[in-house]
Every structure is written in structure tokens, then in C-alpha cells.
């Protein structure tokens, strides 16, 4: 009987305080032809950590695209309000990115591959519906630290839709 009560209390506490989110960046998918998936886990009501993975599907010759072909971004968010539906947050992130950068050598244009790591910050806002629907938008920038072949700045822009469970 004690085990049953313990299991029921654990299940009810998990449902009462949803701590996990899965999201898809719809702006990237529609505008830039890339897929960015994110997972976020709450440490407290005011802080969370997560990871997002960006896969660029646009061709290298496309004028409007991210420089990065692939980017994995672990992040930490601090929420400045404890409102249950609308939250404003600040984010620190580390972006591990790789792609191709266009260069000119001896009057020839070529693409040079790179892999680099960026540190950056972002700000944003999140809406949480009572049923678990999540909509968040954020904007930020990071700076690549290690490679001389990589772009200096890395954008962090998104409009996500997802589910809290």
C-alpha cells in the first residue's frame, strides 16, 4: 500500500509541475529552410537548461541562409517573471557550429569548411497555455572563438512552437 501511495504521489507531482518542453522553430522552417528542434528542462520556476539542434537545408548558393550547416546549442535560461502564462527570459548559450564560408583566393571563389564554438546571449519571451502549448520568441548573438575560417558572429533567432509535459 505504501508503494502504491508513493507511486501515485510521484505521478501527481510530475503532472502538477510540468518540467520538460519539446519545441520546433517554425520561423526557421518556413523562412530559411532549416530545422531547429529544442528540448528544455526546468530546474526551478525561474531557471531552465536546454539544447537545440539546427540543420540547415538551404543550398550553399542561396542568398538568405544561415552560414552554419549544423549547430548544436546548449543553453541556460533565467526567467525574470513568475507569471504562469507570459515569461520574459535572458539566455546564455554555447553554439558548436560547422559550415562553409565563402572565400576568394587568386581570383577564384571557393568554400572553406569550418567548425567552431561560440559564446553568446539572447533575450526572449515565452507564452505557456494552460493545456501545455508553448510559443516562444527570442533574439541573440554569439561570437565564434576558435577558428579563423569561421564567421565572426553567430545569430540566435527563433520563433518556437512546442509542448510542455
Model regions and ranges:
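Outer-membrane beta-barrel "beta-signal"
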Residues: 153-165
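Sec/Tat signal peptide C-region and signal peptidase I cleavage site
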Residues: 14-18
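Solvent-exposed loop/turn segments connecting transmembrane beta-strands
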Residues: 23-36, 60-67, 84, 145-154
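Sec-dependent N-terminal signal peptides
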Residues: 3-13
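Gram-negative (and chloroplast) outer-membrane scaffold detector with strong preference
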Residues: 40-137
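Positively charged n-region of N-terminal signal peptides that target proteins for export
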Residues: 1-4, 19
